[in-house]
């Protein structure tokens, strides 16, 4: 069965508290979604603002492969606003639960039914494709909900949507009301699930199993309050889990991780490390038992291949690590400790872990070199001097001095802020000496307050396209950023050096 993917990242996703996108940003995300292969892009709510209308027009003008839809309340003013920006497809809604009727709309059930019918008829009379949505459907009286769906179907609706507006449904109940909608309307049915109880994806899948043909989803599950059903989790669950029926989507799954990171950066919402499919830890392993299993056969502790979603697996050496995982990491660099050496290295790593320290790849190699008496394994790049200057009315600049493999280099550069200036100065040195460039930079706050800890994540890339990532945590954003870049440079340059040494041997 082919399942239709209706992406509402640009509408419901943007309603996440604190998220606000420019028209240009919405356009770039729309292009990414189209490349990913979604069937429908809900581009926004035309009545909201001039910027929203501009964004929708820009997206429509791109002539993307995906259908472009816009939100409209069940009234002529909203529908006219959608028509004015050039939309041919609207998602129109009105609440049907008694709590919404009493406290928000101040309408009777008969009045709500009349408005729903009128909106659908008006939209169809203007030549629009109309998807009707009964807001708060899962808390609505079931018989009244069936009546509304039946009447809007008679009025000409093209599609019916069942929103679990406050994430109140269970998978079983979602299946029941989906069957109701399919039987009453004989129309294609969509499900729109929120994640207030962590059941959005499960409810969406249950709706599909019960006869729905489409799910409303967002990248990374962003959305109001606790968010919406996550596109990546929903798609991969349909594709990989055993449901007794084969489901297909048009999603290019190898682009999921890249799309997730792209959206995360633009909306300013960090993806939690343990998030399914796209979280940093989704294909990371530290435990010795798990690492040994994965090295023998990845399927022992991975339900899917990371490459299927544009990822790679990674191993972490820490207090829970085992000999097999550690040796596999060292083997990558041509280092083969004997049994006694391996145990010594692992003991040192575990001792650091017991002290609450995170052992980086470079630190592991340094420990290994000391135990194995290997020469030439060291931190290739060392920060020997660093200062920044910034202020109102002055251009921020930074001075950086690096020791690279025994040679001193220094540079100064400007930037839009002290962090940018510092990274530009480092880039000025490394671009000339080692052909390594800073590919990506991310910043997240770990704790609150003026003395909050920040976490900086960076990616660096060499001329051959090899990429290394590094993280640093600290109270000072500028210093932490510089340290993360230095760690990343050491990783990629040390990896290159040891691989050359391995080939030479």
Give names to the regions the model predicted:
Residues 19, 45, 68, 72, ...:
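Hydrophobic alpha-helical scaffolding
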Residues 466-469, 473-502:
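Mixed-charge, glycine-accented linear interaction segment located at domain edges/termini
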Residues 397, 405-434, 439-446:
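Small-residue-enriched alpha-helical segments and adjacent helix-cap loops
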Residues 398-402, 446-469:
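Positively charged, aromatic-enriched nucleic acid-contacting surfaces
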